[in-house]
């Protein structure tokens, strides 16, 4: 009896081994298949996600490019209007009006009604430090470089005060793009809006690259990115030559665009994460430039 039970147990064990073995092998093969399928799906999903992200970035870049192009057109329109009004003002009789030179802003003359916007308007000191500089949105500042006489420049300065209302209107509507507007005459006179002080003692607009390199053809010129001598900020300038009725060059009208303000206006989508950054590139040469 006992021998018979032992034989039965042995037979049962053999049968279990025969039956379970294939099941284990099948389960192992199924697991490998599922793992391989999961890996393929993950790879395909990753590729699809990367492709979708690439397309989204291309769309964002295209939208930003269109936006920057609209801003460029706006700035050029404002600049042409500024140049036209400056030409008209310079041909008119000099009005009897107050003219505030840079030292009046340095002295914070009460009539200027100066205000401070520390996050935007700053000036660079001689030691290289940068601090907020008060500005006047109802006044232009006039600056005469070393070697020039204010008395000889005052009439043109008085004439250019006629542009203040135009500057104020443009600033109100487009202050997120336009940082500063100015007129630099061949006589050395510089008119700038909004009014501010803190000019370097040796400053002369006629020595700046955007003035010296202007083609004087009447077309708008965009200067490469550069550091502003007064604020220490990175700017790009749009400039256009001014001419008298005889066609003689008399100066340059210009608009400063702060690269910081421009980049801050280009907000990346939240889906790209907090580590995403916006940047502008300056193309100095292209392989197909002569094609």
Map each language-model feature to its residues.
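Extracytoplasmic/periplasmic sensory segments of membrane signal-transduction proteins
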Residues: 62, 68-216, 266-270
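Extreme N-terminal signal-anchor transmembrane helix of membrane signaling/transducer proteins, especially
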Residues: 3-43
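Short extracytoplasmic/periplasmic juxtamembrane "stem" segments immediately C-terminal to an N-terminal membrane anchor
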Residues: 40-59, 103-108
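Membrane-proximal, non-catalytic sensory/regulatory domains of signal-transducing membrane proteins
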Residues: 215-241, 276-279, 283-285
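Solvent-exposed, extracytoplasmic
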Residues: 158-174, 252-291
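Conserved beta-strands of PAS-like sensory domains
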Residues: 204-205, 231-269
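Short, acidic, Ser/Thr-enriched surface-loop or helix-capping motifs
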Residues: 185, 244-245, 282
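Extracellular structured ligand-interaction cores
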Residues: 76, 178-180, 187, 220, ...
